[in-house]
């Protein structure tokens, strides 16, 4: 809305809708975190309880359990996959609308200006979501703590 119809932004995005979107995002994040934490807490941990990672994340913690963590891995992939795919779908749909709006601009200079503005945003979104996706969307059989540590450093440096 902000790019396609900038003058209509305050009408089509009232403060109440923005608040609902923020509340929904926070609620989804809390629900995901609580589910992962509640499913991880009853698992027994044995041996050296030193996490070989920079962050106390779910995947490194699952590597320390003595029991079968397949249910937790399934929950992790399901929740993170659903969240990631929903966000990706929303982003792709919004970029399609933006692309259609940009292509309807008559002047070449205006199209170039709009594309250059959107290109930096697209690069930022890509640099934000690709490392997060690589870190959280690996199935347990392909999961590598070393690869996730590299991804975590890359993500931390970018963000």
UniProtKB/Swiss-Prot annotation:
Its main location: membrane. Residues 1-16, 104-116 are cytoplasmic. SUPFAM superfamilies: Family A G protein-coupled receptor-like (SSF81321). GO terms for cellular component: plasma membrane. Residues 42-82, 138-148 are extracellular. Pfam families: 7tm_4. Glycans are attached at residue 80. It is a multi-pass membrane protein. InterPro entries: GPCR_Rhodpsn_7TM, Olfact_rcpt. Keywords: Cell membrane, G-protein coupled receptor, Glycoprotein, Membrane, Olfaction, Receptor, Sensory transduction, Transducer, Transmembrane, Transmembrane helix. PROSITE patterns: G_PROTEIN_RECEP_F1_2 (PS50262). One of its GO terms (molecular function) is G protein-coupled receptor activity. It is found in: Cell membrane. The chain crosses the membrane at residues 17-41, 83-103, 117-137, 149-159. Odorant receptor. Belongs to the G-protein coupled receptor 1 family. This is Olfactory receptor-like protein COR8.
